[in-house]
């Protein structure tokens, strides 16, 4: 069964973008590929148990078991050795991706204090959008009383769009609240 946002994409958003952007084929219309959520836990170098809390929180958010990321290089400045766990990430595709984007745009982002929209400048030039969130407690799935430390996360939305303008129009139609 398709999610609400996925159904809206196939029935409403894709045909609108097809007309607006003047494509010759329906296959040219940009679509979402995946959403990658990354949570860097720098304190994990001294206390590995802090990473476990981040893994549990990310699993509650996405409904998917996160992958623990490890350091690629040793850096003496950060007391870091190659192979040490330093963060966690999840790659969402399909129904879970659309469900997460729906919750992000309609529930989580409006709960951010003094929220005026996400910046339009966070596109990478190839149609992908990356945003940072300072607190994980904006998501209703996270129990505020069980949070040991406020942690931020990076959310990257990967699309098939060729340019920033195409990706902007796609995400705007999905309901992403861009700053005016």
Curated annotation (Swiss-Prot):
Protein transport among keywords: no
GO MF, one example: rRNA binding
The keyword Cytoplasm is assigned to this record: no
Pfam family, any one: Ribosomal_L5_C
GO terms classed as biological process: translation
GO cellular component terms given for this protein: ribonucleoprotein complex; ribosome
Keyword annotations of the record: Ribonucleoprotein, Ribosomal protein, RNA-binding, rRNA-binding, tRNA-binding
Functional note: This is one of the proteins that bind and probably mediate the attachment of the 5S RNA into the large ribosomal subunit, where it forms part of the central protuberance. In the 70S ribosome it contacts protein S13 of the 30S subunit (bridge B1b), connecting the 2 subunits; this bridge is implicated in subunit movement. Contacts the P site tRNA; the 5S rRNA and some of its associated proteins might help stabilize positioning of ribosome-bound tRNAs.
Family, similarity comment: Belongs to the universal ribosomal protein uL5 family.
PANTHER family (UniProt xref): 60S RIBOSOMAL PROTEIN L11-RELATED
NCBIfam families assigned: PRK00010.1
Oligomer and partners: Part of the 50S ribosomal subunit; part of the 5S rRNA/L5/L18/L25 subcomplex. Contacts the 5S rRNA and the P site tRNA. Forms a bridge to the 30S subunit in the 70S ribosome.
Name of the molecule in the record: Large ribosomal subunit protein uL5
Organism per entry: Mesoplasma florum (strain ATCC 33453 / NBRC 100688 / NCTC 11704 / L1)
């Amino acid at each position: 069964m398709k999610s609400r946002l996925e159904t809206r994409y196939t029935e409403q958003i894709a045909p609108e973008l097809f007309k607006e952007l003047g494509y010759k084929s329906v296959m040219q219309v940009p679509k979402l590929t995946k959403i990658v959520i990354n949570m860097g836990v720098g304190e994990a170098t001294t206390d590995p148990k802090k990473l476990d809390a981040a893994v549990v929180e990310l699993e509650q958010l996405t409904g998917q078991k996160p992958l623990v990321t490890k350091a690629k290089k040793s850096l003496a400045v950060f007391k870091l050795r190659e192979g040490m766990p330093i963060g966690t990430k999840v790659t969402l595709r399909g129904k879970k991706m659309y469900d997460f984007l729906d919750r992000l745009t309609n529930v989580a982002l409006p709960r951010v204090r003094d929220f005026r929209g996400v910046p339009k400048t966070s596109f990478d030039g190839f149609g992908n959008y990356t945003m940072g969130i300072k607190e994980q407690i904006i998501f209703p799935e996270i129990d505020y009383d069980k949070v040991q430390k406020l942690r931020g996360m990076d959310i990257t939305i990967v699309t098939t769009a060729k340019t920033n303008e195409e990706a902007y129009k796609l995400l705007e139609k999905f309901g992403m609240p861009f700053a005016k």
